Amino acid sequence: MEDLIIISNLNDFIFCPASIYFHKLYGSQDNLLYQSSAQINGTKAHETIDEKTYSTRKSAMMSLDVYSEKYGLCGKIDLYESDKKRLIERKKHVRQIYDGYIFQLYAQYYAMTEMGYEVKELFIRSMDDNKNYKIALPENDPDIQQKFEQLIAEMRTFNLETFYQTNIEKCKNCIYEDACDRSLNRGE
């Protein structure tokens, strides 16, 4: 059996595959030692979902563990509104919709449908301004669906030993930059 891919790692892998390694390395440390203020704020904003206190509506399912056998993915959903058959991925602040956000939502979608839930709508919600962004279902966006499957294939064959980051902006914005021997930002 192949190793399971954690759904949240889909977005992390796109940003920088090495960040997943560092996240696991520092994972047991106090996050104040290595997380940026934006990440700490995002984690804090997510507490109501993780603690299942975001809503008291019976139709609101929060922080549900999910698994997709087809894609070998596991993780948690943020919010499923069973009365509307709506799956929602919440983000602290959305400036633009990145592919990684969509891929996380697709992974949750496949896991939910494999587990027997009906999902008719996908949304990304920006928590700071309460804006909702409707995302096409995978079957209605074959290009993004293909990119999703390609990303999973890349993750399964990835070799950290041969990886070198090519985007200096990612290094400049990485919380692990000081610890990373692959950073393009050395000496600045």
Task: Spell out what each predicted region is.
Residues 90-98:
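Short beta-strand-loop-alpha-helix junction that forms the active-site gateway
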Residues 1-87, 103, 185-188:
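Metal-dependent nuclease catalytic cores that hydrolyze phosphodiester bonds in DNA/RNA
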Residues 101-112:
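Short, charged, amphipathic alpha-helix that recurs within catalytic cores of restriction-modification
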Residues 58-70, 96, 114-188:
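Metal-dependent nuclease catalytic regions and adjoining charged, substrate-binding loops involved
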Residues 33-37, 44-52, 111, 132-136, ...:
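Short amphipathic alpha-helical patches
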Residues 86-90, 132-134:
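Short small-residue beta-strand/loop micro-motif enriched in glycine and branched aliphatics
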Residues 13-14, 20-22, 29, 108, ...:
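Broad hydrophobic/π-residue packing in well-ordered secondary structure
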Residues 39-40, 105-107, 137-138, 151-152:
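Short, charged/polar low-complexity linear motifs in solvent-exposed/disordered segments
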